[in-house]
Regions:
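Short beta-strand/turn micro-motifs composed of small residues
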Residues: 1, 47, 91, 109-111
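Conserved catalytic-core segment of nucleotide-activated headgroup transferases in glycan assembly
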Residues: 1-62
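Short amphipathic alpha-helical segments, especially helix-boundary/capping motifs
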Residues: 5-9, 34, 70-74, 121-126
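Generic alpha-helical secondary structure signal
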Residues: 23-26, 58, 77-81, 143-147, ...
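Surface-exposed alpha-helical segments enriched in charged/polar residues
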Residues: 30-37, 84, 147, 151
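Donor nucleotide-activated moiety binding/catalytic core segment of transferases
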Residues: 46-103
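Catalytic binding pocket for nucleotide-activated donors in carbohydrate/polymer assembly enzymes
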Residues: 61-68, 95-165
Length: 166
């Protein structure tokens, strides 16, 4: 009887290489690195995996060299606290990024992974159909436009960011 079973629904049978999947991070990090060097800022990486943080740190160090800090959440400081203290949060397809938007914090969604792996469900705001780009998001890779979106959102105040995004 099928009522005594449960179903696990897998995503489409996508065959994606690790290098292809994480090329989105590499592309975005190169832009962030350029901006941070121009503005004299450090990039703070909000670590995702407590148990694999050395592996994650090494990934970022390879791209950013020494131009970053690495925050690991704890009982005293959660990922939400780290985001709340940031001038701007940038994400590719993190749930925490969308949560940060809903909390009214200046956030930029650079949802370029869908274009890279040919899967529209990675586009910004999916499943809602959104324009391919807006004042604080983009769903395709355009180096110069991404650069401009990040710089613009860093430079505007929170009130203007909210008025443009809500």
């Amino acid at each position: 009887d099928s009522r005594n079973n449960f179903n696990f629904l897998n995503r489409e049978n996508l065959k994606i290489q690790w290098e292809q999947y994480y090329s989105a991070e590499k592309k975005i990090l190169e832009i962030l690195k350029k901006i941070s060097l121009e503005m004299g800022l450090l990039i703070n990486i909000c670590a995702r995996f407590k148990e694999r943080n050395k592996e994650e740190y090494n990934f970022y160090e390879k791209i950013l060299k020494k131009n970053f800090t690495f925050s690991i959440s704890s009982k005293n400081e959660t990922q939400y606290d780290i985001c709340d203290q940031s001038e701007l949060v940038v994400f590719i397809d993190s749930t925490l990024g969308y949560e940060n938007i809903s909390r009214g914090n200046k956030t930029v969604g650079l949802s370029i992974r869908g274009e890279i792996i040919n899967d529209k469900s990675f586009n910004f705001g999916w499943p809602k159909t959104m324009k391919p780009n807006g004042p604080s998001w983009i769903s395709y890779y355009d180096h110069m436009l991404i650069y401009k979106i990040i710089k613009y959102n860093f430079d505007i105040d929170n009130e203007k960011w909210i008025s443009e995004n809500f």
